[in-house]
């Protein structure tokens, strides 16, 4: 660009800003006190998260007994996670089948609702009891905690799990195996109940469709405390006479309650409820009526609760703390009773003050609780209100709603401090220090953001693990783990002390912020927590995102071009309260159109020749500037040439001629040399050599061998028994030489023969030859060598399958001396041995799979086999030891009796036959159940000594007349009695038949809803639960189910010896929808 105006425009466009303080802002705004906020970016290094594809609604969290794993329940999934880093151990999909979903859709429910939402997740020993909504057909399973795919049992979820994912519920499992659940028991949610099932005690529930017991409750939590089981919930206040309002309540039942007798059968006789008060004191108190969550500290008998205002009022939340003794005091006080609907609610003395679940020892009501059954039916609501520990809530905040809480007890430098963690409906965790004394207040220490900026969602679950000081948060799409001790976040002493964090203090020895456990000395550990921390409101500015690229214009001298421009603002955030302005450009410019311009010419290049005519070159390029984005290209040539040295003549040319041919190699083999030559033309001053050499015929010469003829036989001065020896010689030489004449005599070969003196046997040369060096000489007294005797054969190298053995001899009998002949023949001899194959011992094959059990009940057996074929025994090897067949017992449980007892034998009929009958006691017999006849007959058996009665005929006419009169009278009498008996019998039969039909219908429906035999989640039997939908009115439901108890309450569903106290609260934070059902 050219010109001063263009340069100034460029500087302003690029936004070269100096660092400067912002303009003065409102001092009052910058001096307000706000609590510290830990952003998602700041908490990121400590945060651990778990996500799974297609898994949402992580609303159930619990720990294994060893506190090494986190068990998570989400929609259609169960997970096992490592506590350390939330890494996945096991994932199990638990989804509804298509038939159940279609049935759910047919009832008008959405695809989102017709899923399996996990709402009960309880750990007992090494088992996991879990229930899901299963598309409005709740079902429960008992699984192995170490392998979630291993299902031990499956039962109906009715009265244990809500039908709808929007219904609030709570459940706990006691040490004796009883399951206490508070939930809606029907599809539309009109029948809420507190229900006990499983275990050894009979099933009980709250009174059905009685608003004085439960009036549209929203269940929050439950706890097993002493002799009682406590439930916390909120409901429409039945005692409130003016309008409709919601009260929060504690309720309790005795764990040894077995229900009433004749009155309150199958119903709690110890159910009582009171009201919890959490309010802001004043001339007109401000009430927080709706309980949202609780947390129980068993060591201190304290129950923390979070309360909010009604959803239709201004959002406000509070935390109140209740002592268990205050709740017990309310239950020991008077009742609040209303005689009838037109009467007022009045206090009534408690007939059983300080009731501790005592039972009757004798009489008609033995084992029943001490409460009078009529009192238990009338007196439900307590008169006194449970007041919190302090008159002012421990913590209050307007314009927010809390949904979940957890409490940790921390040892500070001087005292124990209670830290409250509050989950909000917009996805943050507020860390609150409870009041240190009655006169002091609470402090909001910090607020932790679990999502990036401008994103939020409600918290689904909150669990604290005190042993590891860790907080686990269940959210819609993931699970988060937050460490409670983050002292290393504070780098300086002022930041550490100023944070007012009860977990942290400054260690003067280590010069860093540590927890009390990490400090080297408590006397050198400094902490100050009497005041509340405040947030530094100074905010440095930060740029927001760039705007999209847009066209803009620019001036280049007299030409106008186009560019692309974008800008950004210093508003994410804007500088506040003395913060620095943003550093960097606020505008960027790119892709500006530009006309091309020539660079200056380069210098002329050197002449292309040193003599004679040559040429020179100079160049320029269109890069000053280069044309861009549609700009004009340069006009003209980018290269110029000119002649040079046109008047400078060149001298004669001196040069080498070409190389001549290669001369003959100096050697035919073994490496020689070749040469070639050239000559210098037009003078003697050519650079370089005129001769060039290179090797040739480098291949090795062939091996030559030369042998001399034998010399004549010459006698040797050695005599033996009158004879003499003669010998002759010859020499052999070999080498790789190009000329055979270059060979020299090498190794000498000698032959000797023995000639007898008499000439009879001639001369013999057997074994008398050998090779000697040319320099070798013979002694005058040579001694020929002789072999010693063979040694014994050595041990065979193998015991079987063809081995080798050897034997030796030595040339020392005698040794050859003075040029004597050496021993001829081998000194070592080999022989094969043990050629038979090795024996093969038999080895068992692997066991086959266990066969199916031979019987389904009453004791059967499994069977598995193996064979001695891996390998089979051979060549005398041992056979396999052990059994080839194994059996094991199975299905040893007693077969269920399907027939009733046989009736007594009937009276003999006219044909002399007796009959007896039996009935099938199963409603739906399967397999071999109820096989056989329902009746059985046999001939009558008479006693041999029995004499039948014989009537003797009388001939007297008087007697005959008397008998006739007697018979006629008695005949009419007997006819009247028989007729009346028949009518009475028919009436009784009709009454018994009607009663049996009604009883059988109830048993049939209840059995269909809750089959006695465990069924699969997706079996057709569980689909019969939908029969409830044919009842459209409350009256019809009442007629269908008198007390709505489940028939399958048997101890087989959960082992009471493996369970501990476990709680599960199904509670949700969508406060705008919790009352929709």
Curated annotation (Swiss-Prot):
Tissue expression notes: In adult, detected in liver, brain, kidney, heart, lung and spleen.
Answer whether the UniProt record assigns the keyword Disulfide bond to this protein. yes
Question: Mind telling me which residue stretches traverse the membrane in this protein?
Answer: 972-992
Pfam families according to UniProt: PSI (PF01437), Sema (PF01403), TSP1_2 (PF23260), TSP_1 (PF00090)
Q: Which cysteines are joined by disulfide bonds?
A: 104-114, 131-140, 254-357, 278-320, 487-504, 496-513, 607-644, 611-650, 622-634, 665-696, 669-701, 680-686, 796-833, 800-838, 811-823, 853-890, 857-895, 868-880
Which residues get glycosylated?
147, 168, 227, 277, 323, 367, 536, 591, 717, 933
Q: Name one GO molecular function term.
A: axon guidance receptor activity
Q: On the Cytoplasmic side, which residues?
A: 993-1077
Where is each Sema domain found? 35-484
Q: Which GO terms describe its biological process?
A: axon extension; axon guidance; axonal fasciculation; blood vessel endothelial cell proliferation involved in sprouting angiogenesis; branching involved in blood vessel morphogenesis; branching morphogenesis of an epithelial tube; cell chemotaxis; detection of light stimulus involved in visual perception
Give residue ranges on the Extracellular side: 22-971
Q: What is its main location?
A: membrane
Q: Where is the signal peptide?
A: 1-21
Family affiliation = Belongs to the semaphorin family.
* Name under which the protein is recorded: Semaphorin-5A
């Amino acid at each position: 660009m050219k010109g001063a105006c263009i340069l100034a425009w460029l500087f302003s466009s690029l936004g070269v800003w100096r660092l400067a303080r912002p303009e003065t802002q409102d001092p009052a705004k910058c001096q307000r006190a706000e609590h510290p906020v830990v952003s998602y970016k700041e908490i990121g290094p400590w945060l651990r998260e778990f996500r799974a594809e297609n898994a949402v609604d992580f609303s159930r969290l619990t720990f294994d007994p060893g506190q090494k794993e986190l068990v998570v329940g989400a929609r259609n999934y169960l997970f096992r996670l490592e506590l350390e880093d939330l890494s996945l151990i096991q994932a199990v999909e638990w989804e509804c089948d298509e038939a159940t979903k279609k049935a759910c859709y047919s009832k008008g429910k959405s695809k989102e609702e017709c899923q399996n939402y996990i709402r009960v997740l309880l750990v007992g020993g090494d088992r996991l009891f879990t229930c899901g909504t299963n598309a409005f057909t709740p079902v429960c399973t008992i699984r192995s905690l170490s392998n979630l795919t291993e299902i031990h049992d499956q039962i109906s979820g009715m009265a244990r799990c809500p039908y709808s994912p929007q219904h609030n519920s709570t459940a706990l499992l006691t040490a004796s195996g009883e399951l206490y659940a508070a939930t809606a028991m029907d599809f539309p949610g009109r029948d809420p109940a507190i229900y006990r099932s499983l275990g050894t005690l009979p099933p009980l529930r709250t009174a059905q469709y009685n608003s004085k017991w439960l009036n549209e409750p929203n269940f929050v939590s439950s706890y097993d405390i002493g002799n009682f089981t406590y439930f916390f919930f909120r409901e429409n206040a039945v005692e409130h006479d003016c309008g409709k309002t919601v009260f929060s309540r504690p309720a309790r039942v005795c764990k040894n309650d077995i229900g009433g007798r004749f009155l309150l059968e199958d119903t709690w006789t110890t159910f009582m409820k009171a009201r919890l008060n959490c309010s802001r004191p004043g001339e007109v108190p401000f009430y927080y009526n709706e309980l949202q969550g609780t947390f129980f500290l068993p060591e201190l008998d304290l129950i923390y609760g979070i309360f909010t205002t009604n959803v239709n009022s201004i959002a406000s939340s509070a935390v109140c703390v209740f002592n268990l003794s205050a709740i017990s005091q309310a239950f020991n006080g008077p009742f609040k009773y209303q005689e009838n609907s037109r009467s007022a609610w009045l206090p009534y003395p408690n007939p059983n003050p300080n009731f501790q679940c005592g039972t009757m020892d004798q009489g008609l009501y033995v084992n029943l609780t001490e409460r009078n059954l009529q009192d238990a039916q009338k007196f439900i609501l307590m008169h006194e209100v449970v007041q919190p520990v302090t008159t002012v809530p421990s913590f209050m905040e307007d314009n927010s709603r809390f949904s979940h809480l957890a409490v940790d007890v921390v040892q500070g430098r001087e005292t124990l401090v209670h830290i409250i963690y509050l989950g909000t409906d917009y996805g943050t965790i507020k860390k609150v220090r409870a009041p240190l004394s009655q006169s002091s207040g609470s402090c909001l220490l910090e607020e932790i953001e679990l999502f990036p900026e401008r994103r939020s969602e409600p918290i689904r679950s909150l669990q604290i693990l005190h042993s590891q000081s860790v907080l686990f948060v269940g959210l819609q799409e993931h699970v988060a783990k937050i460490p409670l001790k983050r002292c290393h976040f504070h780098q300086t002493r002022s930041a550490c002390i100023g944070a007012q964090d009860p977990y942290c203090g400054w260690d003067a020895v280590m010069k860093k912020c540590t927890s009390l456990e990490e400090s080297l000395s408590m006397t050198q550990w400094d902490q100050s927590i009497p005041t509340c921390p405040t947030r530094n409101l100074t905010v440095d500015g930060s740029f927001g995102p760039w705007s999209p690229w847009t066209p803009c214009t620019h001036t280049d001298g007299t030409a106008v071009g186009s560019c692309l421009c974008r800008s950004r603002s210093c508003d994410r955030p804007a500088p506040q309260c003395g913060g620095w302005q943003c550093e960097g450009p606020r505008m960027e410019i790119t892709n500006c159109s530009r006309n091309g311009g020539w660079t200056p010419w380069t210098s002329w290049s050197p002449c292309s020749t040193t003599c004679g005519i040559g040429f020179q070159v100079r160049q320029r390029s269109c890069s000053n500037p280069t044309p861009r984005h549609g700009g004009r290209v340069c006009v003209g040539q980018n290269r110029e040439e000119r002649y040079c040295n046109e008047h400078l003549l060149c001298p004669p040319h001196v040069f080498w001629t070409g190389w001549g041919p290669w001369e003959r190699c100096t050697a035919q083999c073994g490496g020689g040399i070749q040469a070639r030559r050239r000559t210098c033309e037009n003078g003697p001053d050519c650079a370089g050599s005129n001769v060039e050499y290179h090797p040739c015929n480098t291949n090795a010469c062939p091996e030559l061998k030369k042998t001399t003829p034998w010399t004549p036989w010459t006698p040797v001065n050695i005599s033996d028994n009158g004879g003499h020896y003669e010998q002759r010689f010859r020499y052999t030489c070999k080498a790789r030489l190009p000329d055979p004449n270059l060979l020299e005599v090498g190794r000498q070969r000698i032959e000797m023969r023995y000639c007898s003196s008499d000439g009879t046997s001639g001369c013999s040369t057997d074994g008398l030859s050998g090779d000697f060096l040319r320099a070798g000489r013979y002694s005058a007294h040579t001694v020929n060598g002789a072999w010693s005797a063979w040694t014994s054969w050595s041990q065979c190298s193998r015991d079987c399958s063809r081995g080798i053995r050897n034997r030796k001899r030595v040339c020392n009998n005698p040794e050859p001396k003075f040029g004597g002949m050496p021993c001829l023949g081998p000194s070592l001899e080999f022989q094969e041995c043990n050629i038979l194959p090795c024996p093969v011992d038999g080895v068992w094959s692997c066991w086959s799979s266990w066969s199916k059990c031979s019987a389904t009940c009453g004791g059967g057996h499994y069977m598995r086999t193996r064979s001695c074929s891996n390998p089979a025994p051979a060549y005398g090897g041992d056979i396999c030891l052990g059994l080839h067949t194994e059996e094991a017992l199975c299905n040893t449980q007693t077969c269920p009796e399907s027939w009733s007892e046989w009736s007594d034998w009937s009276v003999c009929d006219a044909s002399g036959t007796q009959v007896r009958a039996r009935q099938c006691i199963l409603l739906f017999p399967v397999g071999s159940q109820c096989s056989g006849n329902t009746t059985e007959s046999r001939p009558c058996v008479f006693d041999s000594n029995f004499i039948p009665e014989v009537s003797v005929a009388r001939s007297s006419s008087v007697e005959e007349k008397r008998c006739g009169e007697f018979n006629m009278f008695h005949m009419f009498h007997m006819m009247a009695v028989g007729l009346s008996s028949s009518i009475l019998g028919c009436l009784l039969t009709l009454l018994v038949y009607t009663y049996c039909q009604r009883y059988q219908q109830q048993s049939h429906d209840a059995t269909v809803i809750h089959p006695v035999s465990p069924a699969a989640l997706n079996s057709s039997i569980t689909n019969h639960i939908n029969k409830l939908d044919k009842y459209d009115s409350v009256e019809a439901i009442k007629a269908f189910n008198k007390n709505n108890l489940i028939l399958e309450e048997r101890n087989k569903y959960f082992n009471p010896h493996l369970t501990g106290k476990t709680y599960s609260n199904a509670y949700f934070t969508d406060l705008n929808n919790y009352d929709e059902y």
